[in-house]
Amino acid sequence: MLPADKTMNNDMLYHTHTLTNGIRLLYVPVESPVVYCGFVVNAGTRDELADEHGMAHFVEHMLFKGTERRKSWQVISRLESVGGQIDAFTTKEETYVYTTIPAQHLERAMELLADIVFHSTFPEHELEHERGVVLEEIQSYNDSPAELIYDEFDNLLFGDTALGHKILGTEKTLQNTTSMRMRQFVQRCYTTDNIVFYLLGNVRGDKLVRLAERYFGVPPTKRTFRRVPPETYRPTTQRSNKDTYQTHCMIGNRAYHQLHDDRFALLLLNNILGGPNMSSRLNMSVRERHGWAYTVESTLTLYVDTGVWSVYVGCDNSHERDCLRLIHRELCDLASHCVSPRALAKAKCQLEGQMLIADENRENMILTMAKAYLQTGHCLSNDEVHEALQAVTADKLRQVAADIFDKRQLSTLIFN
């Protein structure tokens, strides 16, 4: 067995091991007939060069289109033939390739995952076909202003930098992508010291290590490419005519990075303001009291060296000013006044409960753990999260709100 590193969610243990080539293993043993496993690669949109917009996402698509020993249909059918599933997605900082598989077919899954991550060939004829698929994916986003506004707001916050670029890229950059450029991107970013393989399931740790050594034994490689830190932020207001039935508004600011001392205070603050609960301040004010919007929410994304906090609302054109006024009023109130002790205790209890419920989705839980281990080398336990949240004071919440919700630092994007 691998040595236990830490008590994790729901009192489970997680274990880690590093292969001789630098690939890290994260293992959570649970009683289940199903195994969740996959690779998370520390390579995403922000690792693209100036002429590679959309490359990380396009590579993710092409991983399923053929390897040195498999055609695309063989990749797809290898796990589906035994009832398994394989999928992938790309973020600004990571690429995930993952499977859900009956436990008895774990070796089949690990061999296939290794084949597509380490031995994909990116055939030209498949590239031309998949280019059309990704272009249609871009068009589907363009037809959804409630999704598109998040991408364009990132561009407002980070400008013409990798963090400001759309994950899907653009039609122009996709047309310029070649198989050779894809292989160069993978060679630069998919290095063994840049990869975590994770597994949650009823598998012995020594078996996992043995299979990993058998199938992941590629030569060691090291990442030499360094991410460019975000440029100086300048708040901006922008209005764009999208010919929509509704007005779509987004207000926000750059936020803290994922290891910032005040990240738990901001997480709690965001949940109070516009988290996924009907009792959030924004939902009660904008939707329940006035009926001016169907969707009003705030979101928080933490990156390795920065973050994004934002509020989104979709409303009738006639209610745009009213909604923005109510949002700013809530922001000002949180930045100017301390929440009551009772409200603070309720907010902490609510957030911890939401986290516990979210952990019942085992796939989401292990994906979250894998990202944390990849980026920080550590997975927080429930006890650590509880202690961090309990340490947040009402005055700390107000200080963080005054910092992040500072009206002089807010950017605004409006589609109408």
Label each region the model flagged.
Residues 2, 18, 74-223, 229, ...:
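Charge-rich, well-structured scaffold segments of protease-associated domains
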Residues 8-34:
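N- or domain-start disorder-to-order transition segments that initiate the globular core
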Residues 22, 29-79, 153, 251, ...:
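Active/ligand-binding-proximal structured segments within catalytic/core domains
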Residues 30-33, 91, 244-245, 406:
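Short strand-connecting beta-turns/loops that link adjacent beta-strands
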Residues 232-233:
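Self-splicing inteins and homing endonuclease
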Residues 236:
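Flexible, small-/acidic-enriched active-site or ligand-binding loops
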Residues 244-252:
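Acidic, glycine-rich loop-and-beta core segments that form the ion-binding/anion-interacting portion
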